Amino acid sequence: MLRSRRNLPCRMRAVDLIRKKRDSAELSREEIDFLISGYTSGEIPDYQMAAWLMAVWIRGLNRSEIASLTESMLCSGELLDLSGLPGKKVDKHSTGGVGDKTSLILAPIVAAGGLIVPMISGRGLGHTGGTLDKLESIPGFNVNLPLEVFRHVLRECGMGLIGQTAEIAPADKKIYALRDATSTVENIGLICASIMSKKLAEGIDALVLDVKTGSGAFMKSEEDSVRLAEVMVETGQRMGKRVVALITDMDQPLGRMAGHSNEVIECIEVLSGRGPADLRELSIELSAWMFFLGDRTKSVEEGRARAETMIVTGQAKEKFKQGIRLQGGDERVVDDSQLLPKARSHADVISSSFGFVTATNCEDFGTALAMLGGGREKKEDSIDHAVGLEFHKRIGDHVEKDEPLVTIHYNSGAKLAEAKGLIAESYEIGEAAPSGKRPLIRRILGG
């Protein structure tokens, strides 16, 4: 547990620790505890924490400091005690992208296969979609459960998906808001501590990380994605957890749909044994690793077979219904997608040339979706769950002139022309198809 301020050396001052990091010196666990506990309690003001964060952004943190920061943030709040629930507890975290919807597929697959999946998720911001926003497109679905109710849901069906509560890693919530306001978000050590402090607070035994790379990812280069993955895997392992990271492609959207209710429909298709091949492949691979790390199978290969069985037998689909029902949602949406929000209008983005799709700027797809009301620029912005993009052409596909590239599903046409222009510019079309097959899963680290 985090030590109280009175047990820390009285000579510590925030200004000294700011100077120390400014000068590239390593901070001890006690010094990091002092900063985090002091800032969380309000004893250290915003301006001093902002100065320290900028020093970290410039000078960086070593692996020991990252582990200490993660543990201090983790222990700033309540640790979810799931020891009373039988079975291993395993979760998945994705760094986010466009059409990134695997949580809604793998949670019921893995829960149906005998593990407990306590998933504390986030909302979309900027060009990336959020799991909570997708779930809230299901009428009545409640993502704001008290922790005791969350435990009950997990006990009943083995899966639960909620938002971060005030009790879970409060230091992270406060520090992230300050990072966002001071341009100190893009730092691997700070990103790792933010993600891992929330995930480890769930009381899990193992964690599977889906670290995206490419034009639609937070980390654009594979090198940066691998560095982040390595740090998160090591941090989790230092704390006694089994952790694996998959580096996966986000140079184009995952699946054929982006937008909240549209993505729910696509998830149901996969749980019904259909759906896009890439979405199905990644969902099964992530589920397989969860089964393996959770000791439900002796190998990842067995895990894939188990995941397939949960889909083919209908057990995963029924588990999804049960999870929706227990969180107050209308489970009928699983069999009748007309009960989900629908956009009033649609418009096609047409190709201006013929050839092959050689690349896409995937981030721009997410930006266009947000522009139409399907995303947020600020956390307090409202969201239109019916807005969506339906992708007809992927990298490597042949395209004729005047052929639809994307269908936009929208309610307000105020920014339609701007969104159409941005989407059209996001496609690169050349005379020849790109050579070689694009791997969906680039690398696997840890495990």
What are these regions (language model features)?
Residues 11-12, 21-84:
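N-terminal glycine-rich anion-binding loops that anchor highly charged ligand groups
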Residues 134-160, 230-236, 240:
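A glycine-rich helix N-cap at a beta->alpha junction
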